[in-house]
């Protein structure tokens, strides 16, 4: 294959090399693009710039053109294996994430001041024909940095949460289970891993192995490198098959991420608090993660909170750490215990609190600081009906008192009946209004559920009176 020959040849340097100018001066750089007689280079200080090809010696010009031609052919091989126009001469971390999202038809999931994300669930809406590297990804998630450049692409194939799941999405996921068995999951995972390995090996060449990730998420992975891109394949028995695509520099770091200072995080959190004249106080700038058609509310919600606090996280890895059951269902206590050391290593402090009764004062201090509060509750259909109706009504509020009276009449009927059972769930409390006696809640079910307002009495009816949060 062309790509294999390219990588085997010293004529093509995937990383930095010395280039000779027309007057004898040299520069160490990496070729990242060519447009006619203009090339794009990345220097060792990681800055990119454009320069006329004529600034180089004639033999160097010929070498650069040959490099560009061979790299373009290699990129075509990888894109054929991908099934989409994914790579070019510019490594992913130098490209706009929105461009990659468009190429892969991934809808935007979240946008914050410190990064954005896009996510596609291929199995939704009859999208089973979607393939990446020959296999169907259940989840394709793209993450950007604050400047909109690609941070990494995370593709999850057969896994214990999505494979065989009979659950719906959002409010409809409760009561769902899985048709998968240990045997059928293992068979699907092995098939996906084999297909992906063969596709990447044919396009790029033989892989290497390395240890990757931090603490409980540390694992042995298979790695392919091409021109500043690293393709990292994880195959964790009984858990998931995943492919992460990132820069070779990030891969060389073994998946470790930098620690952001507590001062910076506190400033970021405080800047995200909004206050309205009607008394609403709520937190913005929290990433959204859609848990999809499975019971991953705990790992999805923890991912959102951890990322808001500057700690990189992925719900599929958190599901493994938290020993989530097939199809979903995670012990909050187990996940807290298992993820605490990682959170502390980044300078953050996990905290839990058991309360006698949920009140606005239970969360007010944290909300004022910009810290989302994770709340364990029963997400009953009656509660969701009230949350949806109240949120819609208050958006066009002309008579707040009448609206709340109508809501509380529904709540009084519920409170006089049996206590809620089942539909165990965790979401976030992200706001309050002391004047109206309402809480703002955020579920990990996509944009529609990012901010809903519920009367405190409705929240009290479904509350299990356990709160969790992470402090800077």
Language model regions located:
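Compositionally biased alpha-helical segments
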Residues: 12-87
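Active-site-adjacent structural segments surrounding the nucleophilic cysteine of cysteine proteases
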Residues: 77-93, 99-100, 107-109, 213, ...
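Short coil-to-beta-strand transition motifs
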Residues: 20-28, 194, 417-428
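Bacterial N-terminal signal peptides
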Residues: 1-8
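Second-shell loop/turn segments in exported
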Residues: 50, 181-190, 283-294, 304-305, ...
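Predominantly the structural core of cysteine protease catalytic domains
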Residues: 329-426, 430-434
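Noncatalytic regulatory segments and standalone regulatory/sensor domains
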Residues: 242-258, 262-281, 400-426, 430-472
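Amphipathic N-proximal alpha-helical interface segments
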Residues: 74-88, 102-192, 209-268
């Amino acid at each position: 294959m062309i790509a294999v020959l390219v990588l085997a040849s010293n004529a093509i340097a995937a990383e930095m090399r010395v280039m000779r100018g027309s007057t004898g001066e040299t520069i160490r750089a990496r070729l990242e693009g060519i447009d006619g007689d203009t090339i794009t280079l990345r220097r060792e200080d990681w800055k990119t710039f454009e320069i006329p090809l004529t600034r180089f010696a004639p033999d160097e010009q010929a070498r650069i053109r040959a490099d560009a031609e061979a790299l373009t052919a290699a990129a075509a091989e990888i894109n054929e294996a991908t099934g989409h126009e994914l790579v070019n001469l510019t490594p992913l971390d130098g490209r706009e994430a929105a461009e990659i999202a468009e190429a892969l038809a991934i809808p935007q999931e979240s946008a914050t001041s410190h990064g954005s994300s896009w996510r596609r669930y291929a199995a939704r809406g009859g999208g089973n024909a979607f393939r990446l590297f020959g296999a169907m990804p259940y989840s394709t998630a793209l993450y950007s940095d604050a400047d909109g450049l690609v941070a990494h692409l995370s593709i999850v194939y057969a896994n214990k949460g999505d494979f065989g799941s009979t659950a719906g999405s959002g409010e409809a996921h409760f009561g769902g289970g899985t048709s998968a068995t240990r045997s059928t999951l293992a068979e699907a995972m092995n098939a996906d891993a084999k297909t992906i390995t063969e596709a990447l090996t044919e396009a790029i060449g033989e892989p290497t192995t390395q240890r990757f990730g931090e603490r409980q998420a540390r694992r042995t992975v298979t790695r392919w490198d091409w021109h500043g891109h690293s393709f990292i394949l994880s195959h964790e028995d009984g858990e998931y098959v995943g492919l992460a695509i990132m820069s070779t520099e990030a891969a060389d770091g073994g998946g470790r991420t930098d620690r952001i200072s507590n001062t910076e995080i506190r400033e970021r959190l405080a800047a995200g608090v909004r206050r309205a004249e009607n008394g609403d106080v709520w937190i913005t700038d929290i990433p959204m993660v859609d848990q999809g058609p499975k019971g991953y509310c705990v790992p999805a919600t923890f991912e959102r909170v951890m990322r808001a606090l500057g700690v990189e996280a992925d719900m599929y890895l958190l599901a493994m750490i938290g020993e989530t059951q097939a199809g979903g269902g995670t012990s909050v206590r187990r996940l807290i215990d298992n993820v605490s050391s990682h959170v502390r290593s980044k300078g953050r402090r996990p905290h839990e609190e058991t309360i006698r009764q949920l009140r606005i004062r239970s969360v007010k201090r944290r909300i004022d600081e910009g810290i989302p509060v994770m709340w364990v509750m029963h997400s009953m259909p009656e509660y969701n009906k009230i949350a949806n109706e109240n949120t819609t009504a208050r958006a066009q509020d002309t008579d707040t008192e009448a609206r709340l009276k109508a809501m509380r009449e529904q709540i009084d009927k519920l409170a006089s009946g049996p206590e809620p059972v089942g539909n165990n769930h965790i979401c976030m409390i992200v706001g309050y209004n002391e004047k109206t006696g309402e809480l703002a809640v955020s579920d990990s079910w996509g944009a529609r559920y990012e901010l809903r307002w519920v009367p405190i009495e409705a929240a009290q009816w479904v509350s299990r009176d356990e709160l969790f949060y992470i402090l800077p």
